[in-house]
Regions:
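Hydrophobic, aromatic-rich transmembrane alpha-helices
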Residues: 190-194, 266-290
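Interfacial juxtamembrane loops and adjacent helix segments
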Residues: 2-54, 66-72
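Signature aromatic-anchored transmembrane alpha helix within multi-pass, membrane-resident enzymes
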Residues: 159, 163, 167, 211, ...
Length: 453
Protein backbone atom coordinates (compact mmCIF):
# COMPACT_ATOMS: atom_id res chain seq x y z
CA UNK A 1 0.00 0.00 0.00
CA UNK A 2 3.00 2.31 0.34
CA UNK A 3 3.22 2.06 -3.46
CA UNK A 4 -0.20 3.65 -3.96
CA UNK A 5 0.46 6.32 -1.36
CA UNK A 6 3.77 7.30 -2.93
CA UNK A 7 2.23 7.29 -6.39
CA UNK A 8 -0.81 9.40 -5.53
CA UNK A 9 -0.46 11.61 -2.48
CA UNK A 10 1.24 14.98 -3.10
CA UNK A 11 3.99 15.24 -0.53
CA UNK A 12 4.65 11.53 -0.13
CA UNK A 13 3.51 10.10 3.19
CA UNK A 14 0.41 11.75 4.63
CA UNK A 15 1.41 10.75 8.17
CA UNK A 16 4.41 13.10 7.90
CA UNK A 17 2.29 16.14 7.04
CA UNK A 18 1.71 18.86 9.63
CA UNK A 19 -1.63 18.52 11.38
CA UNK A 20 -2.23 14.88 10.52
CA UNK A 21 -1.45 13.22 13.85
CA UNK A 22 -3.84 13.49 16.81
CA UNK A 23 -6.75 14.66 14.67
CA UNK A 24 -9.70 13.02 12.93
CA UNK A 25 -9.74 12.48 9.16
CA UNK A 26 -12.68 11.18 7.16
CA UNK A 27 -12.42 7.92 5.28
CA UNK A 28 -12.69 9.86 2.02
CA UNK A 29 -9.24 11.32 2.76
CA UNK A 30 -7.68 7.85 2.69
CA UNK A 31 -9.76 6.79 -0.29
CA UNK A 32 -8.30 9.68 -2.27
CA UNK A 33 -4.79 8.49 -1.43
CA UNK A 34 -5.53 5.18 -3.15
CA UNK A 35 -6.27 6.69 -6.56
CA UNK A 36 -4.90 9.32 -8.93
CA UNK A 37 -6.78 12.53 -8.17
CA UNK A 38 -4.83 14.40 -10.87
CA UNK A 39 -4.49 12.04 -13.87
CA UNK A 40 -1.10 11.98 -15.59
CA UNK A 41 0.40 14.50 -13.15
CA UNK A 42 3.71 12.64 -13.04
CA UNK A 43 5.37 15.29 -10.91
CA UNK A 44 3.53 13.75 -7.94
CA UNK A 45 5.12 10.26 -7.96
CA UNK A 46 8.40 11.65 -9.30
CA UNK A 47 8.79 14.16 -6.49
CA UNK A 48 7.46 11.78 -3.85
CA UNK A 49 10.34 9.41 -4.46
CA UNK A 50 12.78 12.12 -3.50
CA UNK A 51 11.76 11.55 0.12
CA UNK A 52 11.66 7.76 -0.21
CA UNK A 53 14.50 5.28 -0.82
CA UNK A 54 13.67 4.11 -4.37
CA UNK A 55 13.77 5.72 -7.83
CA UNK A 56 10.43 6.78 -9.38
CA UNK A 57 9.85 4.93 -12.67
CA UNK A 58 7.71 2.08 -11.33
CA UNK A 59 5.52 4.48 -9.36
CA UNK A 60 4.94 6.44 -12.56
CA UNK A 61 3.90 3.19 -14.24
CA UNK A 62 1.33 2.51 -11.51
CA UNK A 63 0.18 6.13 -11.77
CA UNK A 64 -0.33 5.64 -15.51
CA UNK A 65 -2.55 2.61 -14.89
CA UNK A 66 -4.57 4.58 -12.33
CA UNK A 67 -4.96 7.48 -14.76
CA UNK A 68 -5.99 5.27 -17.68
CA UNK A 69 -8.35 3.04 -15.69
CA UNK A 70 -9.76 5.15 -12.84
CA UNK A 71 -12.59 2.72 -12.14
CA UNK A 72 -10.50 -0.43 -12.00
CA UNK A 73 -9.81 -0.22 -8.26
CA UNK A 74 -7.49 -2.13 -5.96
CA UNK A 75 -5.71 -4.45 -6.29
CA UNK A 76 -6.16 -4.75 -10.06
CA UNK A 77 -5.00 -1.27 -10.98
CA UNK A 78 -1.67 -2.06 -9.31
CA UNK A 79 -1.44 -5.61 -10.61
CA UNK A 80 -2.10 -4.61 -14.22
CA UNK A 81 1.38 -3.07 -14.74
CA UNK A 82 2.91 -6.18 -13.17
CA UNK A 83 1.01 -8.49 -15.51
CA UNK A 84 2.02 -6.43 -18.54
CA UNK A 85 5.69 -6.40 -17.48
CA UNK A 86 5.81 -10.13 -16.80
CA UNK A 87 4.01 -11.16 -19.99
CA UNK A 88 6.25 -8.82 -21.97
CA UNK A 89 9.25 -10.30 -20.15
CA UNK A 90 8.23 -13.82 -21.18
CA UNK A 91 7.85 -12.70 -24.80
CA UNK A 92 11.24 -10.97 -24.86
CA UNK A 93 12.88 -13.94 -23.14
CA UNK A 94 11.45 -16.23 -25.82
CA UNK A 95 12.87 -13.94 -28.51
CA UNK A 96 16.22 -13.84 -26.72
CA UNK A 97 16.45 -17.61 -26.39
CA UNK A 98 15.21 -18.15 -29.95
CA UNK A 99 17.86 -15.78 -31.26
CA UNK A 100 20.62 -17.32 -29.15
CA UNK A 101 19.74 -21.02 -29.53
CA UNK A 102 17.98 -20.81 -32.88
CA UNK A 103 15.22 -23.33 -32.21
CA UNK A 104 11.60 -23.13 -31.07
CA UNK A 105 11.27 -25.70 -28.29
CA UNK A 106 14.30 -24.66 -26.21
CA UNK A 107 13.21 -21.02 -26.48
CA UNK A 108 9.57 -21.78 -25.65
CA UNK A 109 10.56 -23.99 -22.71
CA UNK A 110 12.91 -21.33 -21.33
CA UNK A 111 10.19 -18.67 -21.45
CA UNK A 112 7.62 -21.03 -19.90
CA UNK A 113 9.97 -22.12 -17.10
CA UNK A 114 10.69 -18.50 -16.25
CA UNK A 115 7.07 -17.37 -16.45
CA UNK A 116 5.67 -20.24 -14.38
CA UNK A 117 8.31 -20.22 -11.65
CA UNK A 118 7.24 -19.41 -8.10
CA UNK A 119 9.41 -16.31 -7.89
CA UNK A 120 8.10 -14.71 -11.08
CA UNK A 121 4.52 -15.54 -10.14
CA UNK A 122 5.18 -13.92 -6.78
CA UNK A 123 6.34 -10.70 -8.40
CA UNK A 124 3.17 -10.70 -10.53
CA UNK A 125 1.07 -10.13 -7.40
CA UNK A 126 3.55 -8.04 -5.41
CA UNK A 127 2.90 -4.37 -6.10
CA UNK A 128 6.50 -3.25 -6.15
CA UNK A 129 9.04 -2.51 -8.84
CA UNK A 130 10.50 -5.98 -9.25
CA UNK A 131 8.29 -7.04 -12.18
CA UNK A 132 9.50 -4.01 -14.13
CA UNK A 133 13.10 -4.68 -13.12
CA UNK A 134 12.82 -8.26 -14.42
CA UNK A 135 11.55 -7.00 -17.78
CA UNK A 136 14.40 -4.52 -18.01
CA UNK A 137 16.90 -7.24 -17.12
CA UNK A 138 15.60 -9.44 -19.95
CA UNK A 139 15.72 -6.58 -22.46
CA UNK A 140 19.32 -5.97 -21.37
CA UNK A 141 20.10 -9.63 -22.09
CA UNK A 142 18.44 -9.39 -25.50
CA UNK A 143 20.55 -6.38 -26.43
CA UNK A 144 23.69 -8.26 -25.42
CA UNK A 145 22.70 -11.33 -27.44
CA UNK A 146 22.16 -9.14 -30.53
CA UNK A 147 25.50 -7.41 -30.03
CA UNK A 148 27.36 -10.64 -29.29
CA UNK A 149 25.97 -12.47 -32.32
CA UNK A 150 26.86 -9.63 -34.66
CA UNK A 151 30.43 -9.60 -33.39
CA UNK A 152 30.68 -13.39 -33.55
CA UNK A 153 29.61 -13.25 -37.20
CA UNK A 154 32.16 -10.56 -37.96
CA UNK A 155 29.42 -8.03 -38.68
CA UNK A 156 28.97 -4.46 -37.59
CA UNK A 157 26.56 -4.25 -34.62
CA UNK A 158 23.06 -3.08 -35.60
CA UNK A 159 22.55 0.60 -34.93
CA UNK A 160 19.43 -0.10 -32.89
CA UNK A 161 21.41 -1.99 -30.25
CA UNK A 162 23.03 1.19 -28.91
CA UNK A 163 19.83 3.15 -28.18
CA UNK A 164 18.39 -0.11 -26.84
CA UNK A 165 21.24 -0.52 -24.35
CA UNK A 166 21.02 3.16 -23.45
CA UNK A 167 17.26 3.09 -22.86
CA UNK A 168 17.14 -0.11 -20.81
CA UNK A 169 20.10 0.87 -18.63
CA UNK A 170 18.60 4.28 -17.96
CA UNK A 171 15.17 2.77 -17.24
CA UNK A 172 16.66 0.14 -14.93
CA UNK A 173 18.57 2.76 -12.96
CA UNK A 174 15.31 4.67 -12.51
CA UNK A 175 13.49 1.53 -11.34
CA UNK A 176 15.64 -0.15 -8.67
CA UNK A 177 19.20 0.63 -7.66
CA UNK A 178 20.00 -3.09 -7.49
CA UNK A 179 19.64 -3.07 -11.28
CA UNK A 180 22.94 -1.19 -11.33
CA UNK A 181 24.57 -4.18 -9.63
CA UNK A 182 23.10 -6.49 -12.26
CA UNK A 183 24.48 -4.18 -14.95
CA UNK A 184 27.85 -4.11 -13.22
CA UNK A 185 28.30 -7.87 -13.54
CA UNK A 186 26.64 -8.42 -16.93
CA UNK A 187 28.20 -5.39 -18.59
CA UNK A 188 31.51 -5.81 -16.79
CA UNK A 189 31.97 -9.38 -18.01
CA UNK A 190 30.84 -8.47 -21.51
CA UNK A 191 33.28 -5.57 -21.54
CA UNK A 192 36.11 -7.91 -20.51
CA UNK A 193 35.16 -10.24 -23.38
CA UNK A 194 35.22 -7.31 -25.82
CA UNK A 195 38.73 -6.38 -24.70
CA UNK A 196 39.91 -9.99 -24.78
CA UNK A 197 38.52 -10.33 -28.31
CA UNK A 198 40.31 -7.08 -29.24
CA UNK A 199 37.07 -5.37 -30.18
CA UNK A 200 38.38 -2.06 -28.95
CA UNK A 201 36.18 0.19 -31.08
CA UNK A 202 33.05 -1.67 -30.04
CA UNK A 203 34.23 -1.65 -26.43
CA UNK A 204 34.60 2.12 -26.57
CA UNK A 205 31.08 2.58 -27.91
CA UNK A 206 29.77 0.12 -25.34
CA UNK A 207 31.35 1.97 -22.42
CA UNK A 208 30.18 5.34 -23.72
CA UNK A 209 26.62 4.05 -24.14
CA UNK A 210 26.40 2.57 -20.65
CA UNK A 211 27.89 5.56 -18.86
CA UNK A 212 25.78 7.96 -20.92
CA UNK A 213 22.70 6.04 -19.77
CA UNK A 214 23.76 6.38 -16.14
CA UNK A 215 24.41 10.10 -16.65
CA UNK A 216 20.98 10.52 -18.23
CA UNK A 217 19.33 8.69 -15.33
CA UNK A 218 21.13 10.95 -12.88
CA UNK A 219 20.13 14.06 -14.84
CA UNK A 220 16.50 12.92 -14.77
CA UNK A 221 16.54 12.06 -11.06
CA UNK A 222 19.51 13.69 -9.28
CA UNK A 223 18.22 12.49 -5.90
CA UNK A 224 19.54 9.02 -6.75
CA UNK A 225 23.00 10.17 -5.69
CA UNK A 226 21.73 10.96 -2.20
CA UNK A 227 19.70 7.74 -2.10
CA UNK A 228 22.70 5.60 -2.97
CA UNK A 229 25.46 7.29 -1.01
CA UNK A 230 23.85 9.13 1.90
CA UNK A 231 20.31 7.75 2.24
CA UNK A 232 19.41 5.36 5.03
CA UNK A 233 19.27 2.28 2.78
CA UNK A 234 22.35 3.33 0.84
CA UNK A 235 24.52 3.87 3.90
CA UNK A 236 23.28 0.61 5.39
CA UNK A 237 24.14 -1.28 2.18
CA UNK A 238 27.64 0.20 1.86
CA UNK A 239 28.37 -0.40 5.54
CA UNK A 240 27.32 -4.02 5.15
CA UNK A 241 29.34 -4.56 1.95
CA UNK A 242 32.55 -3.23 3.46
CA UNK A 243 32.09 -4.96 6.81
CA UNK A 244 34.47 -7.93 6.59
CA UNK A 245 34.12 -8.99 10.21
CA UNK A 246 31.55 -11.72 9.57
CA UNK A 247 32.65 -13.53 6.42
CA UNK A 248 31.47 -16.89 7.76
CA UNK A 249 28.00 -15.46 8.31
CA UNK A 250 28.08 -14.04 4.78
CA UNK A 251 28.86 -17.49 3.42
CA UNK A 252 26.03 -19.02 5.43
CA UNK A 253 23.64 -16.38 4.19
CA UNK A 254 24.63 -16.95 0.56
CA UNK A 255 23.90 -20.64 1.02
CA UNK A 256 20.49 -19.83 2.48
CA UNK A 257 19.64 -17.50 -0.40
CA UNK A 258 20.78 -19.98 -3.05
CA UNK A 259 18.62 -22.70 -1.51
CA UNK A 260 15.69 -20.27 -1.29
CA UNK A 261 15.97 -19.37 -4.96
CA UNK A 262 16.61 -22.92 -6.15
CA UNK A 263 13.55 -24.18 -4.27
CA UNK A 264 11.42 -22.05 -6.57
CA UNK A 265 12.63 -24.14 -9.51
CA UNK A 266 12.36 -27.54 -7.88
CA UNK A 267 15.45 -27.72 -5.68
CA UNK A 268 19.16 -26.97 -5.74
CA UNK A 269 20.44 -30.53 -5.92
CA UNK A 270 18.11 -31.50 -8.74
CA UNK A 271 19.31 -28.77 -11.07
CA UNK A 272 22.92 -29.02 -9.93
CA UNK A 273 22.95 -32.70 -10.89
CA UNK A 274 21.10 -32.09 -14.18
CA UNK A 275 23.36 -29.27 -15.34
CA UNK A 276 26.55 -30.99 -14.15
CA UNK A 277 25.58 -34.22 -15.92
CA UNK A 278 24.73 -32.29 -19.08
CA UNK A 279 28.07 -30.49 -18.95
CA UNK A 280 29.96 -33.78 -18.58
CA UNK A 281 28.09 -35.36 -21.51
CA UNK A 282 28.72 -32.34 -23.72
CA UNK A 283 32.39 -32.24 -22.76
CA UNK A 284 32.81 -35.88 -23.70
CA UNK A 285 31.16 -35.13 -27.03
CA UNK A 286 33.84 -32.57 -27.71
CA UNK A 287 31.93 -29.43 -26.79
CA UNK A 288 34.12 -26.77 -25.22
CA UNK A 289 33.62 -23.45 -23.47
CA UNK A 290 33.28 -21.26 -26.52
CA UNK A 291 30.54 -19.72 -28.62
CA UNK A 292 27.13 -20.09 -26.98
CA UNK A 293 28.66 -22.08 -24.14
CA UNK A 294 30.95 -19.18 -23.28
CA UNK A 295 28.02 -16.77 -23.37
CA UNK A 296 26.00 -19.06 -21.07
CA UNK A 297 28.94 -19.36 -18.67
CA UNK A 298 29.15 -15.58 -18.56
CA UNK A 299 25.47 -15.36 -17.62
CA UNK A 300 25.93 -17.84 -14.78
CA UNK A 301 29.06 -16.06 -13.54
CA UNK A 302 27.32 -12.68 -13.61
CA UNK A 303 24.36 -14.16 -11.72
CA UNK A 304 26.64 -15.68 -9.09
CA UNK A 305 28.42 -12.36 -8.60
CA UNK A 306 25.09 -10.57 -8.25
CA UNK A 307 23.86 -13.03 -5.60
CA UNK A 308 27.07 -12.72 -3.60
CA UNK A 309 27.11 -8.92 -3.59
CA UNK A 310 23.39 -8.36 -3.07
CA UNK A 311 23.37 -10.87 -0.23
CA UNK A 312 25.95 -8.65 1.47
CA UNK A 313 24.06 -5.43 0.74
CA UNK A 314 20.37 -6.33 0.99
CA UNK A 315 18.54 -5.82 4.29
CA UNK A 316 16.64 -9.13 4.05
CA UNK A 317 17.07 -12.64 2.65
CA UNK A 318 14.11 -12.16 0.30
CA UNK A 319 13.67 -13.59 -3.19
CA UNK A 320 12.51 -10.28 -4.67
CA UNK A 321 16.03 -8.87 -4.55
CA UNK A 322 17.29 -11.69 -6.78
CA UNK A 323 14.52 -12.32 -9.34
CA UNK A 324 16.31 -10.14 -11.89
CA UNK A 325 18.83 -12.97 -12.44
CA UNK A 326 16.20 -15.66 -13.05
CA UNK A 327 16.02 -15.05 -16.80
CA UNK A 328 19.81 -15.11 -17.13
CA UNK A 329 20.05 -18.43 -15.29
CA UNK A 330 17.17 -19.98 -17.23
CA UNK A 331 18.69 -18.80 -20.52
CA UNK A 332 22.08 -20.27 -19.63
CA UNK A 333 20.58 -23.62 -18.61
CA UNK A 334 18.52 -23.67 -21.81
CA UNK A 335 21.68 -23.23 -23.88
CA UNK A 336 23.29 -26.22 -22.13
CA UNK A 337 20.28 -28.54 -22.25
CA UNK A 338 19.45 -27.66 -25.86
CA UNK A 339 22.76 -29.21 -26.94
CA UNK A 340 21.96 -32.61 -25.43
CA UNK A 341 19.34 -34.01 -27.77
CA UNK A 342 18.60 -31.63 -30.67
CA UNK A 343 16.46 -34.30 -32.36
CA UNK A 344 14.27 -34.79 -29.28
CA UNK A 345 13.78 -31.20 -28.12
CA UNK A 346 10.26 -31.74 -26.80
CA UNK A 347 11.86 -33.66 -23.92
CA UNK A 348 12.93 -30.25 -22.62
CA UNK A 349 9.31 -29.75 -21.55
CA UNK A 350 10.08 -32.12 -18.66
CA UNK A 351 11.86 -29.15 -17.07
CA UNK A 352 8.42 -27.75 -16.31
CA UNK A 353 7.62 -30.65 -13.98
CA UNK A 354 9.84 -29.61 -11.02
CA UNK A 355 9.01 -25.95 -11.60
CA UNK A 356 5.28 -26.59 -11.37
CA UNK A 357 5.80 -28.98 -8.45
CA UNK A 358 7.60 -26.18 -6.59
CA UNK A 359 4.26 -24.39 -6.24
CA UNK A 360 3.29 -27.18 -3.84
CA UNK A 361 6.56 -27.45 -1.94
CA UNK A 362 7.46 -23.73 -1.89
CA UNK A 363 4.23 -21.79 -2.57
CA UNK A 364 3.92 -18.14 -3.51
CA UNK A 365 4.49 -16.10 -0.34
CA UNK A 366 3.08 -12.89 -1.83
CA UNK A 367 -0.55 -13.99 -1.87
CA UNK A 368 -0.76 -13.12 1.86
CA UNK A 369 -3.37 -15.78 2.47
CA UNK A 370 -2.91 -15.29 6.21
CA UNK A 371 -4.77 -11.98 5.85
CA UNK A 372 -8.07 -13.73 5.08
CA UNK A 373 -9.02 -14.26 8.77
CA UNK A 374 -8.32 -10.59 9.44
CA UNK A 375 -10.73 -9.48 6.72
CA UNK A 376 -13.42 -11.77 8.08
CA UNK A 377 -12.88 -10.48 11.62
CA UNK A 378 -13.21 -6.85 10.48
CA UNK A 379 -16.27 -7.40 8.30
CA UNK A 380 -18.79 -6.28 10.95
CA UNK A 381 -16.78 -3.26 12.08
CA UNK A 382 -15.17 -2.06 8.84
CA UNK A 383 -17.11 1.22 8.76
CA UNK A 384 -16.71 2.23 12.41
CA UNK A 385 -14.39 5.12 13.34
CA UNK A 386 -10.92 4.03 14.43
CA UNK A 387 -8.19 5.27 16.74
CA UNK A 388 -4.69 4.18 15.77
CA UNK A 389 -1.91 3.74 18.32
CA UNK A 390 1.55 3.15 16.92
CA UNK A 391 4.63 1.82 18.73
CA UNK A 392 6.66 1.04 15.60
CA UNK A 393 8.83 4.12 16.01
CA UNK A 394 7.99 5.72 12.67
CA UNK A 395 4.78 7.54 11.80
CA UNK A 396 4.07 5.87 8.46
CA UNK A 397 3.94 2.30 9.82
CA UNK A 398 0.10 2.18 10.13
CA UNK A 399 -0.20 3.18 6.46
CA UNK A 400 -0.22 -0.58 5.90
CA UNK A 401 -3.90 -0.42 6.88
CA UNK A 402 -4.66 2.34 4.38
CA UNK A 403 -7.23 0.30 2.48
CA UNK A 404 -9.09 -0.40 5.73
CA UNK A 405 -8.96 3.26 6.74
CA UNK A 406 -10.57 4.24 3.43
CA UNK A 407 -13.73 2.30 4.37
CA UNK A 408 -14.08 3.86 7.81
CA UNK A 409 -16.14 6.84 8.87
CA UNK A 410 -13.04 8.52 10.26
CA UNK A 411 -9.58 7.73 11.65
CA UNK A 412 -7.43 9.40 14.32
CA UNK A 413 -3.77 8.37 14.52
CA UNK A 414 -1.96 9.10 17.77
CA UNK A 415 1.32 10.99 17.65
CA UNK A 416 3.06 8.35 19.78
CA UNK A 417 4.20 10.81 22.43
CA UNK A 418 1.56 9.75 24.98
CA UNK A 419 -0.81 7.07 23.70
CA UNK A 420 -3.10 7.24 26.72
CA UNK A 421 -3.54 10.99 26.34
CA UNK A 422 -4.02 10.71 22.57
CA UNK A 423 -6.67 8.02 23.02
CA UNK A 424 -8.47 10.09 25.64
CA UNK A 425 -8.41 13.19 23.42
CA UNK A 426 -9.70 11.25 20.41
CA UNK A 427 -12.62 9.82 22.37
CA UNK A 428 -13.51 13.21 23.83
CA UNK A 429 -13.36 15.04 20.48
CA UNK A 430 -15.87 12.86 18.61
CA UNK A 431 -19.16 11.17 19.37
CA UNK A 432 -18.21 7.49 19.52
CA UNK A 433 -21.30 6.10 21.27
CA UNK A 434 -21.90 3.88 18.26
CA UNK A 435 -18.58 2.19 18.90
CA UNK A 436 -15.09 2.50 17.47
CA UNK A 437 -12.16 0.25 16.62
CA UNK A 438 -8.81 0.55 18.35
CA UNK A 439 -5.73 -0.28 16.30
CA UNK A 440 -2.55 -1.06 18.22
CA UNK A 441 0.42 -1.45 15.90
CA UNK A 442 3.01 -3.72 17.51
CA UNK A 443 1.05 -3.73 20.75
CA UNK A 444 0.52 -6.70 23.03
CA UNK A 445 -3.22 -7.45 23.07
CA UNK A 446 -3.50 -7.34 26.87
CA UNK A 447 -1.53 -4.10 27.02
CA UNK A 448 -3.81 -2.53 24.43
CA UNK A 449 -6.93 -3.72 26.25
CA UNK A 450 -5.68 -2.27 29.53
CA UNK A 451 -4.94 1.04 27.84
CA UNK A 452 -8.44 1.16 26.36
CA UNK A 453 -10.10 0.41 29.69
Amino acid sequence: LYTYELANYPGGFYALQDGYLDSWHDGSFYKAVLSAQQPFAYSIPWNNQKIDVHPPLYYCLVYTAESLFPGLGLPWVGLLPNFVCILAGAAVLYCTAKRLIGRFWPAWTAAACWLLSVGVQGMAVFTRMYSLMMLEGIVLLYCHVVLWQALQAGQKPPRAVWPGLFAVTMAGALTQYFFLVFCFFVCGLFGIWLLAARRFKTAGGYVITEFAALAAAYAAFPTMKAHIFSGSRGKEAFASVFDLSALAEWGRSIGTVVQLLAAQFGGLWLWAVVVAAAAVVLWRRGCRLRGKGLFAAGLLLASAGYVALIDKAAPFEADRYYVVIYAAVVLAVAVVLARLAPKHETLLLLALVPILAAHRTDPNAYLYEDAAPRKAALADTERLPAVVLNKAGYEVAPDLFLEEFAKREAVDQASGEDDAASLRAAVESRDLHGGFLLYGYIYDADELRALAE
